[in-house]
Amino acid sequence: EKTKLIVKEMLDLLALDLVEKGLVTNQIVLTIGYDKDNEYHGEMMIDRYNRKIPKHARGTINLERYTSSSKLIIKEVIKKFDEIVNRNLMVKRINISASNVLYEDKVKDMIYHRQLNLFTNHQNINQKDEKEALEKEKNLQKATLKIKQKYGKNAILKGMNLEEGATTRERNEIIGGHKA
């Protein structure tokens, strides 16, 4: 659960980075690296130090549309995380990257098609409400960025950043991988 919390924090920061730079993505790649475990008898690989370690878990998440919404990104990536992670192994490394990144203004005019389902009441799906919710979230992300730029990265935190095992506060104080 601590690993899942850290993944959520990293995704939230990734979404904020996308908003800050005016970018959107439709694909996230999640890689989980495990610590060496002598008790593990599954698939192994050799690391750069020539040690046998459990093979890392990797998942590619294709989003329905280009987005920088942390809610949409977190929801989809956590689903994939639950599928690929081996809960019996200790996680040593988490890599998250956004692929297929475009500038936001290039995708504004894109038309998204949704596959219809015979069992869904399509009259209840209101795309206007969904679009307003995404716009509201983007405005909140922009306001968060302004506060962080003015008062520091730890000036505004989410509740998950205060939970036990959360690492955002410590990561915000690190510069280039070293404590400031």
Regions of interest found by a model, annotated:
Residues 1-180:
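Basic, low-complexity intrinsically disordered segments
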